[in-house]
Curated annotation (Swiss-Prot):
Changing F425A: Loss of self-renewal in embryonic stem cells in absence of LIF. Does not interact with NCOA3. It is found in: Nucleus; Cytoplasm; Chromosome. The gene is Esrrb. This is Steroid hormone receptor ERR2. SMART domains: HOLI, ZnF_C4. InterPro entries: Est_rcpt/est-rel_rcp (IPR024178), NHR-like_dom_sf (IPR035500), Nucl_hrmn_rcpt_lig-bd (IPR000536), Nuclear_hormone_rcpt_NR3 (IPR050200), Nuclear_hrmn_rcpt (IPR001723), Oest-rel_rcp (IPR027289), Znf_hrmn_rcpt (IPR001628), Znf_NHR/GATA (IPR013088). Keywords: Acetylation, Chromosome, Cytoplasm, DNA-binding, Metal-binding, Nucleus, Receptor, Transcription, Transcription regulation, Zinc, Zinc-finger. A zinc finger (NR C4-type) spans 103-123, 139-163. Binds DNA as a monomer. Interacts with NR0B1; represses ESRRB activity at the GATA6 promoter. Interacts with NANOG; reciprocally modulates their transcriptional activities and activates POU5F1 expression. Interacts with NCOA3; mediates the interaction between ESRRB and RNA polymerase II complexes and allows NCOA3 corecruitment to ESRRB, KLF4, NANOG, and SOX2 enhancer regions to trigger ESRRB-dependent gene activation involved in self-renewal and pluripotency. Interacts with KDM1A; co-occupes the core set of ESRRB targets including ELF5 and EOMES. Residues 203-433 are annotated as: Essential for ESRRB transcriptional activity and interaction with NCOA3. It comes from the Eukaryota.
Amino acid sequence: MSSEDRHLGSSCGSFIKTEPSSPSSGIDALSHHSPSGSSDASGGFGIALSTHANGLDSPPMFAGAGLGGNPCRKSYEDCTSGIMEDSAIKCEYMLNAIPKRLCLVCGDIASGYHYGVASCEACKAFFKRTIQGNIEYNCPATNECEITKRRRKSCQACRFMKCLKVGMLKEGVRLDRVRGGRQKYKRRLDSENSPYLNLPISPPAKKPLTKIVSNLLGVEQDKLYAMPPNDIPEGDIKALTTLCELADRELVFLINWAKHIPGFPSLTLGDQMSLLQSAWMEILILGIVYRSLPYDDKLAYAEDYIMDEEHSRLVGLLDLYRAILQLVRRYKKLKVEKEEFMILKALALANSDSMYIENLEAVQKLQDLLHEALQDYELSQRHEEPRRAGKLLLTLPLLRQTAAKAVQHFYSVKLQGKVPMHKLFLEMLEAKV
């Protein structure tokens, strides 16, 4: 991986590895006076932020996200009321402004989310052409070419590999949209004289569940990579550094993900923050659990960072390993599907134990919507198990207990000053304790 691809922005005082990175969050700025003594940050993700005593700036996910002259910027007092003044994240950090996203492939300005990833029109078209044409590329060098806005055309092989690495989905490309593809497909069916061609086809009835699950699946991370630092010796410091950096990047993605939950954006800004601050660790742990399902007695913190019991013991994470593994075994026994995990993540957010809810009725309405979505999904997909929705909901208390253990563990790491922690992860951690 080149230094250019690893660097998140010239305006940031420090950086972590982001290739591949989670999609941008749509958050404007981070500003909070930390109990641990951090200075107030007044810039956006694209502006260098002041750091904690043991803290680093969270990665800048956007270009041109500065707050100067931004009509959407509000003062902390204007945005929050009473109880939220002590919140670990100021409301201007959330959804007031939509700065420019960066293409995760080449760093150009992203035009939106294409095939599951924030990307520019050029990389979107390149990926589509490659998949539809079933094109194979060969790198003339060592398969490690830098892919930037200026050099993205220099090596198609490395550009395509980076598309896949940051999470672009091959399945998202419609093969029948190749020029002339639909006509060819139709002629082929006609030639087969299938007896079913003349039967009327009625589209399946669309329920609210379909929209909810589609929204959640559409913004779900496909692959997550930790990319452990090579300059730190193996041991507890390397493991903790890797996991803290990973959590910080996941949090940026998580906040963007939450905006796509039907009903969540309509909550007050204060309630959005309260739910996120309360449930973020539960959501991250559900991600670990889902990635760990294919393995036996191992935890997949990321695609390239998998720990067994012995590794966990050596780096001081044995208690956390056992707690999360208990959840993995429970979900394995239930044979939980991806769609169910997506709904459970949303439910974990909505069922937060936060005491700082401003509009309880609106939050309860969101809870009811998601409970109904889970029940509808089970009725339509697992109708042979009438009690399945209830069994899944009964896993949430254990999830909350496990998340509490994880928060306490990493907060103790923070107090010991063992490893540097990026600003977003650190502030969410402090808000939870």
